[in-house]
C-alpha cells in the first residue's frame, strides 16, 4: 500500500473554521460596538468634569476679571480671554488656547451630533456643564450642579 504525504487542512475543514469565525463575529460585534461607545461617553464625561472643575476653580479666584455675574448659559465668547480673565483661566486650566480645541476633544455620538459643550451657571453661582440635552440619558451628558445622576 502506498503512503501519501498529506499535510495541511482540507477545504472542508477551512470552510468550517471560517463559518465558525463568522458566527462569532456576528454575535460579538454588536457587544463590542456598545462597549466602544460606552467608553467614548465616559471619556466625554471626564472632559466635561474637567471643564466643570476649571470653571468652578476660576470663579473662586477673586483676582480674575470677567467672572459671569448673571445666571444662564455662558456664551462661548466668554470662555475666551487673556490671562487674568475668568475665560482665560478656564482655557489655561484645560491646557488649550481656544474653546474650539475643547469641543474637538468630544468623541461620543451624542457629542458629535451637537459638537458643542454648554456651560451654564445658576443663581447661586453653581456651574452645570453639558453636551446634548441637559440630562444623563441617551441624548445628553451632564456634570455639575444641574446633573440629575
Where do the PLM segments sit?
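Bacterial Sec-dependent N-terminal signal peptides
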Residues: 1-5
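N-terminal single-pass transmembrane signal-anchor helix
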Residues: 6-32
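Aliphatic-rich helix starts adjacent to a transmembrane/signal segment
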Residues: 32-50
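Alpha-helix exit/C-cap motif
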Residues: 53-74
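N-terminal pilin/flagellin-like segments and related low-complexity appendage regions
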Residues: 61-65, 78-109
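Short, surface-exposed interaction loops/tails
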Residues: 75-83, 97, 107-149
